[in-house]
Amino acid sequence: MKRFIYIIAILSLASCSFLEEDPQGKLTTEGFFTNASDLDASLNSLYSVVATSQQQNNFVGTDFLHGDDISTHPASNKQSLREFDQYTVADNNAWMQTLWEQRFKVIKAANFIINNASRTPDVAQEDIDAAIAQAHYWRAFEYFYLVTTWGPVPVMLSEVIDYNAPLVSEEKIYELIISDLKTAEAGCPVTYSKAPYFQNGVNVAVSQAAVKATMAYVYMCMAGWPLNKTEYYEKAADKAWEVIQGTMDGTYYYELLTAFSDIHSMAHNRNNKELLLGIYYNRDRHPNAIPATDYLLEMAGGWGDTQGEIKFWKEFPEGPRKTATYFPKLMLNGTLQDWWYDTDPASREVVAPIFMKTVESDVRGAEYDYTSGKACPSNGEKTVQVIRFSQVLCWYAEAVGRSGKVTAEAVDALNRVRNRADGAVTDMYSTAMSPEELAEAAYNEHGWEVAGYYWSGFATRARDMFRMYRYKEHFEYRVANPLIEVAPGVFRKEAVPVTGSWNDSRMYAPYPYTDSAVNPSM
């Protein structure tokens, strides 16, 4: 326990800005990594820092609001969120600052292991390699977040802070990400053999399959904007297929859960075999602040941070997936209403569909009942779902299509996802599709699979739109903000106004002022 506290102290020294550390306060790593307990403590600490970085939405980010699936409140205390929803982010955006600093806290924790763990004595080399591999994964994960949110950023590969670190280009950062992921792929086990890395029949720590899946999506992003190196689509397809084939030959245990409603259920919260990578929480020891964030202020206990965009909801195919994604009805003033309900004259500030993936019951372990009218707890323990197997199936199909091909395997992968979404074997996709049709179908299916779910900050709908350079199209749609018929004779539109004209600077967030004021390169 003392070792764990000591390493937490080392890794928590970063101030509000990662560039504002006092160099006189730098601690030496000498005296650590002297035995197996130190190695375990360093990993436990890394995962604690990772969990903290995802435990509330001002840590995990706000760039997800660029997506066409999700919006925010037009007033209240949501200015930091609205700026992202409107593509007009200021460099003093308070939430962006925490988003930025959390990424570098994880990077610092990962660097601590990468640069020091190899000297641990009396530990099997396999265990050392696995620890270092996991650290490389999380460093890659955070640099992926940084490069897709800010573009060129400083690169820190040690615990020493360089106050004059130059900005590194997107291409070079992607090279670092792939290098880190290749190290992780070589060192992360297929299945862990002991707790806490393996619990309830699933990997809790980063596994080989999770790394391969991550590489597949990173390659897809490298094939898209801004690098536009389309040859990477074939690499993405190959890497996604390695995961899929591994589930077919028994190398990996991952599978699609039978019903979409199972995915975010409490029954599968800690033993979800569709989940390639999750971040786990406990209400008593390390809770998250997720349950109340994403439903309306006027619902019991809601924080009203996000709601669904109307056009996306309208185009979302009906079926069990849609039913499990959005509240079927909203409890408003003690009465269940359709989301488009309003008083006469109109009085509701936000009239929009509401996502239901992150809510939790006030009774621990019970499934949430949207008809009860009871508030969600402020402290939650739903697992943050970083990558699911259904996403890998979509990525495979899209990457095959964007490579100019249509294969039976890609079509089958996409039908597996859609059949579950429909709750029946519809097999709506076929090899008669063109490559472009296959790619767009997979892109859409992935969007519907992850709609409104931004907690890992990895392959969100916004990230898909970023790599396909579709922010501009959505920005112009939001400027127009047309009325949409959501029920016979009932028309609604977005509550948050978007104005101005497009330029590509809106693709990225500005660097936080607190850091750009310190580093002249920013």
Residue ranges and their predicted role:
Residues 3, 13-37, 140, 177, ...:
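Bacterial Sec-dependent N-terminal signal peptides
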Residues 37, 43, 47, 52-54, ...:
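Elongated scaffold/linker segments in the mid-to-C-terminal portions of large proteins
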Residues 30, 56-74, 189-209, 220-298, ...:
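Short, surface-exposed recognition loops and adjoining beta-strand edges that mediate ligand/DNA contacts
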Residues 40-54, 76-150, 163-175, 181-196, ...:
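Conserved, well-structured interaction surfaces
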Residues 147-149, 154, 192, 221-228, ...:
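Short coil/turn linking the two alpha-helices of tandem helical-hairpin repeats
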Residues 16-66, 97, 112, 518-522:
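Acidic, glycine-rich segments characteristic of secretory precursors and extracytoplasmic regions
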